[in-house]
Structures are given as C-alpha cells and as structure tokens.
C-alpha cells in the first residue's frame, strides 16, 4: 500500500508524515511538491489603502553606499511629484553619509565624496523628503530596496513610514514578461 502526500509551495508535511508512518512497514510514502517558479506572492502595490495614482504620486530613487540599510548609508534622494499626470515638483538632495563612498559605488552611481562632503545629513534631508511625499503614493523601480533604506532611517529618527508604494519591477514582470530582464533601462527602452 502506498500513500502520496503533496504540499503546495513547501515541504512542511513531509517530516511529519514520514515520522507518523515510520512505525510500520505497511505503507510506502510517495512525496510530491507543487513548486512555484515565479514569486507571484511579491506585491506590486504594497500597503494599499485605496489611494489612487490618478490624483498624485511621487516617483523616486535613492543612491546608497551599499545594499544593507543597517550597514550602509543613503547618499542621494531624487524624486518628482506628479499630480493629474503632470510633474508639479522636484526633489533632489545629496546626503552626507559621514563615511567614505566605496569606489565600486562611486563607479556605479557617479557620486563621489567631494559631491557629498558639504551636504546635510540624513537627519535633515529625510524629513524634508517625507514631507515632499505626504499624501502621495510612492513609485520606485525595485521599491523594496529603496523603501527599506527610507524605512530604516525613518525608524532611527523616530519617524513613522507606512507608505503605499508601487514597485515598477513587479509591474514590468506582469506587463512585459517577454523581456526576461527587468533593469530600469531595459524596461524604459521597451516602453
């Protein structure tokens, strides 16, 4: 006699089933798993509160000294505010990270120590940026990266940061699956 067990997207039941049936030799276990090749659980719109892109949104990007919010620093925030389909305001600020910018980041971003040495710190710029964004949906390419840095630094400053945001990487994967690569320049060329 055989018993087939199938889990969906995980293998949590396998050890339990094997243990339960290990006491007797009358059953043969057949394990199966439904796997997901695409992370369709990743949200395109995060913290949706019914806000609409028809009214106003802020498209933004940050540059950092690395890839980990708790270890690396924001060195630039750039954004445009769009109201009723028109760019109505711009935000562009360098931030002094108070640490040297690694050469690899300088090559990647074009931002060097001389460009940020006289800039204000994140404690001055981040509240201005959040004020600029107030009442707007945020939009970014790979938004989880950008918002993780904003969130971490906001927490360090005692500022709440529960925004609604749209990740254009997820949107591009959904709308342009034939691309294969979803770097911002690749998506922009396709559009």
Kindly give the residue locations of the regions a language model identified.
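Phosphodiester-processing cores and adjacent nucleic acid-binding clamps
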Residues: 1-64, 80-81, 86-87, 98, ...
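Short, intrinsically disordered, charge-balanced linker/junction segments flanking boundaries
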Residues: 158, 187-191
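Generic structural marker for isolated residues within well-ordered, non-membrane alpha-helices
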Residues: 102, 126, 150, 184-185
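Active-site acidic carboxylates
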Residues: 68-104
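Metal-dependent phosphoesterase signature
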Residues: 108-126
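Gly-rich Lys/Arg/Thr-decorated short loops/hinges at beta-loop-alpha junctions or inter-strand turns
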Residues: 103-111, 165
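Glycine/alanine-rich phosphate-binding loops at beta-alpha junctions
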Residues: 88, 97, 107-109, 123, ...
């Amino acid at each position: 006699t055989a018993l087939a067990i199938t889990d969906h997207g995980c293998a949590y039941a396998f050890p339990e089933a094997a243990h339960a049936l290990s006491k007797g030799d009358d059953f043969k276990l057949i394990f199966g798993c439904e796997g997901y090749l695409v992370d369709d659980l990743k949200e395109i719109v995060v913290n949706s509160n019914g806000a609409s892109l028809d009214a106003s949104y802020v498209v933004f990007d940050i540059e950092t000294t690395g890839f980990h919010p708790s270890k690396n620093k924001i060195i630039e925030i750039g954004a445009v505010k769009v109201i009723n389909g028109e760019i109505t305001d711009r935000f562009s600020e360098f931030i002094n990270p108070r640490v040297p910018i690694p050469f690899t980041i300088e090559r990647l971003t074009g931002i060097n120590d001389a460009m940020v040495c006289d800039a204000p710190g994140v404690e001055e710029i981040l509240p201005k940026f959040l004020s600029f964004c107030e009442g707007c949906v945020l939009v970014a390419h790979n938004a989880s990266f950008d918002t993780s840095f904003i969130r971490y630094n906001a927490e360090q400053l005692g500022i709440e940061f529960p925004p609604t945001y749209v990740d254009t990487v997820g949107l591009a994967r959904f709308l342009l699956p034939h691309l294969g690569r979803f770097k911002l320049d690749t998506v922009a060329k396709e559009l």
